């Protein structure tokens, strides 16, 4: 009799994905973030489900319902803060996961990479709409500013914005539809993640050396299940430290003031994980130009496989490319800092220089450095 894990139609899929999956023997802790993202998604769906049971998507009661969750619902405060800070953890894992893909050349699996970019856009849209739901000052004005960017699209812009708003300003209709989308999108993300995994398992995982590992594979269970559990424990520990000791560390104080269309906050800014893109948007004086740069700052990931000029896949043995990679990381941290600063001298200039450097590094410096390294190795 064959093992049920290998014969049952459903269990067989799980077995081939998480138990008997052949994995390279040398993948490092940087390969933990995929499973951590799965855990983050499950955590967000569960906490979000319990929040949705008590939340009301009406402009008159949305803010009060969030207050009610924190004050009157049993353990409502911890569910709310786990959901809010869970989003930050989600993005930390996402950025690490993408950085790993860039460093070790995982983008050469083009289908997996492109689904990943689609996932990134979907997660960003979900997080943005979630930020609007508490209906605080920053929720309202963030929604107004970001949706207004679509008015920069020639000819159809204004109609498009009013169609998204469901009226002539961000109001009850906007909040209701944002809640509906915020509820459904995580399930679409889960489906896309399954497709992401499907494409990954067609080729097998990459590894730090960037070389083929077909000659040296080990089963996923128990080796990588135990490794993933360690990563999970560290993630939960970091999240709970944040939630229990400083839950508002990454939030904005303005969001504790109910939304008021007649009073604009002095500095409108999104959550920290969007600040790098927000800084790129603000660094261009023209509205349409800013929106294009904003979209391209993420979409640029799609051209990475085309810009790969090196004869080696990974950056493990390419010191010049490594330096440029860490320059890019430093540049993104600079952009994140600038995005949270007011629009005044010297922040405007720093933001513009950092934005130029971001695109220049990916589009020009990295391909050139790869070609120089090829010459060094006489390839």
Swiss-Prot record:
InterPro entries assigned: Cyt_b/b6_C (IPR005798), Cyt_b/b6_C_sf (IPR036150), Cyt_b/b6_N (IPR005797), Cytb/b6-like_sf (IPR027387), Cytochrome_b (IPR030689), Cytochrome_b_C_euk/bac (IPR048260), Cytochrome_b_N_euk/bac (IPR048259), Di-haem_cyt_TM (IPR016174)
Keyword match Heme: yes
Residues the entry annotates as binding a ubiquinone: 201
Membrane topology: Multi-pass membrane protein
Membrane-spanning segments: 33-53, 77-98, 113-133, 178-198, 226-246, 288-308, 320-340, 347-367
GO-annotated biological processes: mitochondrial electron transport, ubiquinol to cytochrome c
Organism this protein belongs to: Salanoia concolor (Malagasy brown-tailed mongoose)
KW Transport (keyword) present: yes
Disulfide bridge positions per record: none
Name the record gives this protein: Cytochrome b
First-listed, main subcellular location of the protein, grouped into a coarse class: mitochondrion
UniProt KW keywords: Electron transport, Heme, Iron, Membrane, Metal-binding, Mitochondrion, Mitochondrion inner membrane, Respiratory chain, Transmembrane, Transmembrane helix, Transport, Ubiquinone
Gene3D superfamilies in the record: Cytochrome Bc1 Complex, Chain C
PROSITE patterns: CYTB_CTER, CYTB_NTER
Taxonomic lineage from the root: Eukaryota, Metazoa, Chordata, Craniata, Vertebrata
Homology family: Belongs to the cytochrome b family.
Assembly mode: The cytochrome bc1 complex contains 11 subunits: 3 respiratory subunits (MT-CYB, CYC1 and UQCRFS1), 2 core proteins (UQCRC1 and UQCRC2) and 6 low-molecular weight proteins (UQCRH/QCR6, UQCRB/QCR7, UQCRQ/QCR8, UQCR10/QCR9, UQCR11/QCR10 and a cleavage product of UQCRFS1). This cytochrome bc1 complex then forms a dimer.
């Amino acid at each position: 009799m064959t093992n049920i894990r290998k014969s049952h139609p459903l269990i067989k899929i799980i077995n081939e994905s998480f138990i008997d999956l052949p994995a390279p023997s040398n993948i490092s802790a940087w390969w933990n973030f995929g499973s951590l993202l799965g855990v983050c998604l499950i955590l967000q769906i569960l906490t979000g489900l319990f929040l949705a049971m008590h939340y009301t998507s009406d402009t008159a009661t949305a803010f009060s319902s969030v207050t009610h969750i924190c004050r009157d619902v049993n353990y409502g405060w911890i569910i709310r803060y786990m959901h809010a800070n869970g989003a930050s953890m989600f993005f930390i894992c996402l950025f690490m996961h993408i950085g790993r893909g860039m460093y070790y050349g995982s983008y050469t699996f083009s289908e997996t990479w492109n689904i990943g970019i689609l996932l990134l856009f979907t997660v960003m849209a979900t997080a943005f709409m979630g930020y609007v739901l508490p209906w605080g000052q920053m929720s309202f004005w963030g929604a107004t500013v970001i949706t207004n960017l679509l008015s920069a699209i020639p000819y159809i812009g204004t109609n498009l914005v009013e169609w998204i708003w469901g009226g002539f300003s961000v109001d009850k209709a906007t909040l209701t539809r944002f809640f509906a989308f915020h509820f459904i999108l995580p399930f679409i993300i889960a489906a896309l993640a399954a497709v992401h995994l499907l494409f990954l398992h067609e080729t097998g995982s990459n590894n730090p050396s960037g070389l083929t590992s077909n000659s040296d594979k080990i089963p996923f269970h128990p080796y990588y299940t135990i490794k993933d559990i360690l990563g999970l424990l560290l993630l939960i520990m970091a999240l709970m430290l944040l939630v229990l000791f400083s839950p508002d560390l990454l939030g904005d104080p303005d969001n504790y003031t109910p939304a008021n269309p007649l009073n604009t906050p002095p500095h409108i800014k999104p959550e920290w994980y969007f600040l790098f893109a927000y800084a790129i948007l603000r660094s261009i004086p023209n509205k349409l130009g800013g929106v294009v740069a904003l979209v391209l700052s993420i979409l640029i990931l799609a051209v990475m496989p085309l810009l790969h000029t090196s004869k080696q896949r990974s950056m493990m043995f390419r010191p010049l490319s490594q330096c440029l990679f860490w320059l890019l990381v430093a540049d993104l941290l600079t952009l994140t800092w600038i995005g949270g600063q007011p629009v005044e001298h010297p922040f405007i200039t720093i933001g513009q220089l950092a934005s130029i450097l971001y695109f220049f590094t990916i589009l020009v410096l990295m391909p050139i450095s790869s070609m120089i390294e090829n010459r060094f190795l006489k390839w």
